[in-house]
Amino acid sequence: SILEDDTVPHIESRMVYTVNTEAAAVLEKLAAAPRIRELGLQFSSGWNETTDKKAGYFDTGWAHPTSWDDVILQGPHLGVSTPMIKQPNPTLKHNQDWSEVDLEAMPADFIPATAYQPDRAAKPTYDADYSKWSTNAGPSPSNSYFRIAWRRMAATTGFRTLYPSLIPPGAAHVNPVH
C-alpha cells in the first residue's frame, strides 16, 4: 500500500485520489455496497485428483451415469454456463480425448459421460467423506446444492479464460474445478 504500513489489511487501504467526480460517485456507491465476504459463501475443493484417487474414492473408466450422484466432473466438462459442454470419449486415449456435446440436441435430463467413476464398493464412505458446508442445521454435503464452478486450467489463447458453470446437486468434481 502507498498510504499505509504492512499492518493495515489490503481491503482497508485508502485510495490516493479519484480522477474525476464521476469516478468519485462510482467509488462512493461501491463503498456503500455489501462486500462479497458478507454473503457467507462457501467453497468445495472437490476430490483431489491424485490423493483421493489413490485412496480409492474413484477410479478411471468411461461410463454414462444415470444419476448426477455418480458424476465426477473434470475441467473439460465445463463450458460457459454449462457443466456439460464436452464429455470424454469411450477410448480415454489421453487428456484431450473429449468430444463436444450438441446442446441443442440433448434431452432435458441429459447427464454427460464421465472418465472418473465413484468406487463405493471399495470406499463405502464415498458420499460421507465428500466436502461439507456449514448450515444452520449442521454440516451438509456440498454436492447437495447447486454450485458455481470454473476450470482452474483454461486456454489463454482466447478472450474468455473464465468458464463459470452451474453444477447441479449430486455431482461431485475434482480439484482442478473450483
Question: Where in this protein do the model-derived segments appear?
Answer:
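Polybasic, glycine- and aromatic-enriched phosphate-binding surface used to engage nucleic acids
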Residues: 1-178
